[in-house]
Design a protein with these regions (language model features):
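Well-ordered secondary-structure scaffolds
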Residues: 1-244
């Protein structure tokens, strides 16, 4: 069992140390019950990839398996896959990383996903033709209000904005809009000019104003490019914590 324990503004645990303590507890519980368990501590200050929303994230996940997904999301997926293979005694960390990379390169990772999708009654055509997904009612471009580097792109606020668009529930029983969500064009560390598109919102037009305000509340600009944050902070196993 490999756990992905996120840390940061968009995570349940906001600091790396808190996330490590949670991971250690979960690993110890699994180990106590005879399971082979590890946990990766991954960053969630800024969203991985470019898409937030149900259908949007499925499309982006398929892009990763096809070998042309966003670099940050692909890297985390490769590290997760490699560590899962290590847990299964398939080789050394380097060998398992190479196996994961090869599965994407030769198409076997995507083929296996399609097989699993079909086994659960899914229409595999949508995995190749994204136009078959339900389409959003409307779209809206969120524009930069000034020039500068994006120094904050709060994952929690972006997640809340996507919920306001209908991609998630504000309360039990709320309907989901599977086509709703956000595509990020600029993320933390990117330079933007005033009037440039930061993100595209998808959903019902009457929800854009509130979602835009929520998104902007977690956005920060600065004159200097911020230091790049790690994608993975640590690996927690029964033998201890390896910090990266």
């Amino acid at each position: 069992i490999l756990l992905d324990v996120t840390t940061g503004t968009g995570a349940f645990m906001k600091t790396v140390d808190q996330s490590i303590e949670l991971a250690k507890l979960m690993v110890s519980i699994g180990t106590h019950h005879g399971r082979r368990v590890a946990a990766m501590i991954t960053d969630m200050d800024t969203p991985l990839g470019h898409n937030i929303g149900n259908s949007l994230e499925v499309m982006e996940s398929m892009d990763v398996l096809k070998g042309h997904g966003p670099a940050d999301l692909t890297e985390v997926c490769l590290q997760l896959a490699a560590n899962m293979l290590v847990l299964a005694d398939k080789g050394t960390p380097a060998e398992c990383r190479a196996m994961a990379e090869a599965a994407i390169a030769d198409g076997s990772a995507f083929a296996k996903c399609k097989e699993m999708f079909a086994a659960q009654g899914g229409d595999t055509r949508v995995l190749d033709d994204y136009s078959l997904f339900e389409q959003p009612a409307a779209s809206f471009e969120l524009l930069a209000e000034q020039d500068g580097y994006i120094v904050a792109n709060d994952a929690e606020k972006i997640g809340s904005a996507s919920v306001l668009l209908g991609a998630g529930r504000q309360k039990k029983g709320d309907p989901l809009d599977f086509a709703a969500g956000i595509t990020l064009h600029k993320k933390r560390g990117d330079y933007v000019k005033k009037g440039e598109s930061l993100a595209t919102f998808y959903g019902a037009a009457d929800k854009f104003e509130a979602a835009a305000a929520e998104y902007r509340s977690g956005l920060g600009y600065g004159p200097e490019k911020p230091e790049e944050a790690p994608l993975v902070y640590a690996l927690v196993t029964k033998d201890g914590v390896a910090r990266y």
